[in-house]
Amino acid sequence: MDRIQENQKKATNLCELYADGNDDDSEKEQQDRGLDAQFLLRSTPEDVEKYMIHVRKQLMEGEGECLVELGAPINSNSKNPKSGLSEEDLDKAADAQLKILEKIPAVGTKVIRRKQTGGGSLFTEVWIIRDPPTEKDFIEARVAVVGNVDAGKSTLLGVLTHSALDDGRGAARTKLFRHKHEFESGRTSSVGNDILGFDVHGNIVNKPDPHNHNLDWVQIGSDCAKLVTFIDLAGHEKYLKTTIFGMTGHMPDYTMLMIGANMGIIGTTKEHLSLALSLHVPVYLVVTKIDMCPANILEETMKNITRLVRSAKKLPILVRNMDDVVHAAVNFPSKKVCPIFQVSNVEGTNLPLLRQFLNIVPLRRQLNENDPAHFQIDDIYWVDGVGTIASGTLLSGTIRLNDILLLGPTSNGDFMPIPIKSIHRKRMPVGIVKCGQSASFALKKIPKKDVRKGMVLVDPKVKPVASMVFEAEILVLHHPTTIKPNYQAMLHIGSVRQTATLVSMGKEVLRTGDRDKVQFKFIRQPEYIRPGTKMVFREGRTKAVGTVSSVVPQESLAQQRAKQKDGRQKQYGKKSMGPKPPNGKPKEKIEKKLDALSIEQLTSAASTSTSST
């Protein structure tokens, strides 16, 4: 049984303990009562069971991890709840919590002890609680790394993932490059993936090979309880389409926007920030190269960053210590705050704070595990001896080995059944993929040319239908002139990337800042898209974002042939072998009539010739 299903069952069983006394008003009031700051010191059976239900609920919402604060009330109905315990009582509360976590079961680790402001000698402790580690299963968080060219994106990722500082000349970034021209230019041109693993207590498990500096992904995946995947995107403007595809197709949970302290907000920085905000992806900022930046330049850069963050209606939080890390991590999923880190890849300044933030920041994804499986493909590979490999993200449901899914749509809009014979997560073979996780599947007996980015693997229960035409509600972020019908642009909808024509719209023309409901039509082939999906379309300097509101289903080639066959059977009958004559008379009767006419004509012609002779 899956870990989440086990937690749900245990939480349900504990809830049933309170169901027996629903008729008693006093017990009902006690059930609705929250937990005060000292409930762990009492550890009554009722409070313990209530706390276990609370922790299990938080673990399910956080996909296996959550943050709790000892010495703070939980769901208290009091208007002025008291927080904080003495250090002696806090130690007792921590011991009591460890015993409770063994019953759940879960593993807890102390993050920080905080002194309450105005509370004298009262303290609280922040703990991170995780499900017990299991083999070949871990919490996965995806972070998109964006920013202007030369902001230090690849260098920071090299330092974080390989636990080695940079030499100031870009040695750390060379560990991540994939192509020859990237080594020569020092600039990322493709979507790169790098991982950072944490064990159940928050310790980093990345151990690069001392000879070739490569990471053993399989070993990291088996040792870690949480795995952070960095999606390294290009910063140069000419690679903007690759960056947009990485933001829409790889489904990041967070965005790390990099800004060079010596350069400030230049180039594509604002564009990348607006892209993340339009896709509703939480953003935190990392200011790099503070070791080589003069104090006055750094101060001016921070003023501009604060002004930019506030213009996006977010509260900037400059992270200076571990208390700021906890405060930023707890409030980050609400999308109302924007943490800002100042780091140096050469001296290592504030890098431990950034690592701890990545360790404890919670996930708040909308899980649809009970829905039918829907897997979007964002990359295709060919492996000798294995065949075609499709990688992507599971948006809903679960996929297990030997499941039969539908792959499509093809250029005709068809979907073909495909058995799942092999599943890998981070290069590690697994037996199941859950909603929100990325994975790779081996597609047997299918050529690589028949699979493309943007295709999906869906449950046959969905009965998927491809579409050429769809409607969307859009917002034009920038356009130099006006947009009219028949305008063409490149659309990014999830992993779908195709040019489409603007067929119709509500207004006569669209300008920068306008909103409207429009209709698009793909120019090449049908795609499988769902209402509610975020989209981005661009063409030159034109940028717009929107949401798919409805789709117009298109009949596949197989459906069209079936309809034509049914139509012929209804028109001519099931036993008809050919087309019906235009006058509607049966073929046999016409032939008999022609034969009779020919005999009469021959007889009359013969009699005429006899009389004439």
Curated annotation (Swiss-Prot):
Origin species: Caenorhabditis elegans
Region feature Disordered, mapped onto this chain: 554-589
Stretches for region G1: 147-154
Domain of life of the organism encoding this protein: Eukaryota
The encoding gene: cgp-1
A GO molecular function held by the record: translation elongation factor activity
Family: Belongs to the TRAFAC class translation factor GTPase superfamily. Classic translation factor GTPase family. GTPBP1 subfamily.
InterPro entries tied to this protein: EF-Tu_GTPase, EFTu-like_2, GTPBP1-like, P-loop_NTPase, T_Tr_GTP-bd_dom, Transl_B-barrel_sf, Transl_elong_EF1A/Init_IF2_C
Record-given protein name: GTP-binding protein cgp-1
Region (G4): 288-291
Chain residue ranges for the region called G3: 232-235
Pfam families: GTP_EFTU, GTP_EFTU_D2
Binding site for GTP: 147-154, 232-236, 288-291
Region G2, residue ranges: 186-190
Region feature (G5): 344-346
Keywords: GTP-binding, Nucleotide-binding
